[in-house]
Amino acid sequence: MNPFSLAKKIFDAKTGKDPIDQDVDHGLPFKAKVGSLITLNVSPFLRAEGTLVKAPDRMQTVVAISRLRMPMDGKLYRLYLTKGDDASEMESFIQVYMTAKGDIDELQYYQRMLRMYPETEVDYNLFTGRSEEGLGFKEFSLWKEQMAGIGYDEVLLDEAFGDEEQLVFERQIPGADFLRPFTATENRIDNSAGSEGLLQEVIFMPYVRELESGGQELLLLSAETVKEQNHRQKQEVHVDFMIGVPLTESDVSIQ
């Protein structure tokens, strides 16, 4: 599995509408359901020495499932281990790309480092691609001082940054200095009846950096506009900084 290939599939996708399923909880990877028990192999997290990712619990429960709808041949799902609807709550999920034939092609584990609420239109435009800088630029840096300022784990910061003041991530899609970020609609269900959930528009771009240990660390930046929660209209705009590592199909077991 090449962590670059999903981004390339999205970038190369033909324009057009993604067919809308009546139920997101259908034909899911690993036959997962809300409430399923998930077991994670710890090896990918141990191999990712120097990462900012906090090693997750080995056994967890799928608390929500979403699908991101956008022009692409396959389907992109997220199996949420924690929803993180509140900024103070951890958000984590396993992102799964399935081919048009229904085969699992790529998996990544992500957890949220930071959620910020843009206060001005200028701030917001940096994470939507409208200003043609910020999100979509070929490189994105995380600064140690900023991460320490939000109270991020000091041990992880020291291991990841070492003597450096910044970590530089490269956009997963090569090419021009700036590429317009991807846009999707995320439909999340929080229970088997579908009576609880979330609907939001997502503008995102994936980045990556090579670790000295030989692994890779993934950075997913997303500007999200919440439209509905539990079938009630809601308007909230925030930007999520998600850090992650690639997984293989054998790293995930669901019952």
Describe the residue ranges of each PLM region.
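Mixed-charge, low-complexity intrinsically disordered regions
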Residues: 1-58, 65-255
